[in-house]
C-alpha cells in the first residue's frame, strides 16, 4: 500500500482524550500492518490560545491569518513547539517512534510568500523526499507541523491542508483529513460516502454544503486534483472506526479528483 498522510485539525489538538484515542488506534493498526504513516498538523486553536494569553491581537484577511514579523515567533512556538511536541509525546506514549519535524526540515518543501499584506504566510510545493524516505524505512512516525522556511531563510506559516497535500505529493501517499465532522451530509443529513467536483458544486449551489464545510470540501478537492486520487474527510471522534480508515476503507466522505 502507498504511505498514508493523516492531516489533523479542528479541536483535536485541544482534546487530550481524543489524541489518546487516535494514537491508540494507530498503534492497534500498526500491530497488523506495515503501512508507512505520517501526520501533518496545524493548530489554529493552540495559536489563538497562546495569542490570547499574551494579549496579542489576531488579524485575518479573507479568512487567512495575518502573520507579521513580530508575531511569527509566537506562531512557530505554538505550532512547531506546543502542538508538535504535544503530538510527539502522545505518540511516544504508544511506542510509535515519533519524530517531530516542520516543513523546512531536510528541505521537504519549497515555500513562497503568498501576499506581503499577510506577512509570514506561504504556499509550499514538494521538494526533497530523502529525509522522509529514511525515517519511514527506519520505522519512524514523522509528525510534521505546518511551519516552513522560504528561500531567504524566513520562517513561514502554511495552511495545514496545503501542507498535508504537499507532503502526500512528495512521497506519493494517500491523504486523509481528520476533523470534527463525519463527512459531507446531503439535504436529509445522510452521510455521502463519495463525491466528485460536479456533485460538490451542485451541493454548494443548493446551499447543502455551507460555511466552514465549503472550506473543508474545497481543500480536499484541491488535494485530490493535485494527488490525482481520492482524499478522505473523516471524523477523529470514532476511534473504533479509525483502523478501518487507515486500511483504506471509507468511513466519512471520499472526495474524487
Curated annotation (Swiss-Prot):
Gene3D superfamilies: Acetylglutamate kinase-like (3.40.1160.10)
Record bears the keyword ATP-binding: yes
Pathway in which this enzyme or protein is active: Amino-acid biosynthesis; L-arginine biosynthesis; N(2)-acetyl-L-ornithine from L-glutamate: step 2/4
EC number assigned by the record: 2.7.2.8
GO molecular function, one term: ATP binding
Enzymatic reactions: N-acetyl-L-glutamate + ATP = N-acetyl-L-glutamyl 5-phosphate + ADP
Protein's name according to its UniProt entry: Acetylglutamate kinase
Native source species: Actinobacillus succinogenes (strain ATCC 55618 / DSM 22257 / CCUG 43843 / 130Z)
Amino acid at each position: 500500500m502507498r504511505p498514508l498522510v493523516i492531516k489533523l485539525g479542528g479541536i483535536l489538538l485541544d482534546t487530550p482524550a481524543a489524541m489518546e484515542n487516535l494514537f491508540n488506534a494507530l498503534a492497534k493498526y500498526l500491530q497488523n500492518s506495515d503501512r508507512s504513516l505520517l501526520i501533518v498538523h496545524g493548530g489554529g486553536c493552540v495559536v489563538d490560545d497562546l495569542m490570547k494569553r499574551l494579549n496579542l491581537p489576531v488579524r485575518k484577511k479573507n479568512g487567512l491569518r495575518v502573520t507579521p514579523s513580530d508575531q511569527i515567533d509566537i506562531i512557530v512556538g505554538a505550532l512547531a513547539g506546543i502542538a508538535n511536541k504535544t503530538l510527539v509525546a502522545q505518540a511516544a506514549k504508544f511506542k510509535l517512534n515519533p519524530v517531530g519535524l516542520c516543513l523546512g526540515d531536510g528541505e521537504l518543501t519549497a515555500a513562497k510568500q503568498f501576499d506581503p499584506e499577510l506577512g509570514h504566510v506561504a504556499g509550499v510545493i514538494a521538494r526533497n523526499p530523502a529525509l522522509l524516505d529514511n525515517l519511514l524505512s527506519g520505522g519512524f512516525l514523522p509528525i510534521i507541523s505546518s511551519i516552513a522556511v522560504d528561500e531567504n531563510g524566513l520562517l513561514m506559516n502554511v495552511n495545514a491542508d496545503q501542507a498535508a497535500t504537499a507532503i502526500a505529493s512528495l512521497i506519493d501517499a494517500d491523504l486523509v483529513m481528520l476533523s470534527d465532522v463525519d463527512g459531507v451530509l446531503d439535504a436529509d443529513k445522510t452521510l455521502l460516502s463519495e463525491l466528485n467536483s460536479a456533485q460538490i458544486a451542485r451541493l454548494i449551489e443548493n446551499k447543502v454544503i455551507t460555511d466552514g464545510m465549503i472550506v473543508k470540501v474545497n481543500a480536499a478537492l484541491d488535494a485530490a486534483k493535485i494527488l490525482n486520487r481520492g482524499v478522505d474527510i473523516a471524523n477523529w471522534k470514532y476511534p473504533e472506526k479509525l483502523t478501518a480508515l487507515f486500511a483504506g476503507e471509507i468511513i466519512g466522505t471520499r472526495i474524487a479528483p
